[in-house]
Regions:
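Short beta-strand scaffold positions
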Residues: 55-56, 122, 142-143
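Acidic, low-complexity terminal tails and accessory targeting/binding regions
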Residues: 1-2, 44, 85-96, 153-204
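Glycine-rich phosphate-binding loop signature in dinucleotide/nucleotide-binding domains
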Residues: 46-49, 131-137
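Short active-site segment of divalent metal-dependent hydrolases/proteases
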Residues: 12, 147-148
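Generic beta-sheet signal
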Residues: 4, 137-145
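Active-site signature of alpha/beta-hydrolase-fold catalytic machinery across serine-
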Residues: 67, 150-154
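Active-site-proximal alpha-helix that buttresses catalytic centers in soluble enzyme cores
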Residues: 2-3, 7-72, 115
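Phosphate-handling substructures
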Residues: 14, 28-29, 70-126, 165, ...
Length: 204
């Protein structure tokens, strides 16, 4: 059996400030608390023979991976398809501002200057399929809250990618076998595409 360990990066300065970040060029290093979380993740993974580590273009994911895998010679690969959602002009906004925008707009509407949540969801499904196509047996995937949340809810068969698993803790390992990750990819695609067909145009 193959194993994919999906985890959100450890606690970052942007988490501490309660601000959103979808631009990998913006710095958001781990806090002292986050560094401790990443090291504890390494302890949790110590019994697993990790063959590959996949992380995103955001520095906090690489920093988490390096601390979790300290002392190990595990190959590492950057996967931009798992990058956090590009929120465009909402870069640096508070979580309250971000949630207010989401509440007022449909999932297929892009953030001003960014991408839509639907586009991000399909990107994540593509990333899951890309992971499934790899030959390694045990893969650590250090990414962000939204792709992990979508994978958890989709694999469980939920009709809502944002629930029932709403909160994804920092540096917590979530285990998926081939079947679970395949179900996640299929369900994310199904929900997103059916939602696009079902959503009425404004004024209807």
């Amino acid at each position: 059996m193959r194993l994919f360990v999906l985890t959100r990066h450890a606690h970052s300065t942007l988490n501490r400030e309660g601000r959103v970040n979808g631009d990998p060029g913006v710095s958001g290093p781990l806090t002292p608390e986050g560094k401790g979380q990443a090291e504890h993740l390494g302890v949790q993974l110590s019994a697993l023979p990790v063959d590959l580590c996949v992380y995103t273009r955001f520095g906090r994911t690489l920093e988490t991976a390096e601390l979790a895998l300290a002392g190990q010679t595990v190959p590492r690969v950057v996967e931009p398809l798992l990058d956090d959602v590009d929120v465009g002009e909402l870069e640096g906004a508070t979580l309250e501002e971000y949630r207010a925008w989401k509440h007022e707009h449909r999932r297929d509407e892009p953030f001003p200057g960014g991408e839509s949540l639907d586009d991000a969801a399909l990107r994540y499904a593509k990333a899951f399929r890309k992971l499934l196509a790899r030959p390694e047996r045990t893969v650590l995937v250090v990414c962000h809250e939204i792709p992990v949340r979508y994978a958890l809810n989709a694999a469980a068969g939920s009709d809502d990618l944002d629930g029932p698993e709403h909160a994804v803790s920092n540096a917590t390992p979530y285990l998926f076998d081939d079947g679970a990750l395949e179900r996640a990819a299929e369900r994310v695609e199904q929900i997103t595409r059916s939602g696009r067909r079902a959503q009425p145009k404004r004024g209807e």
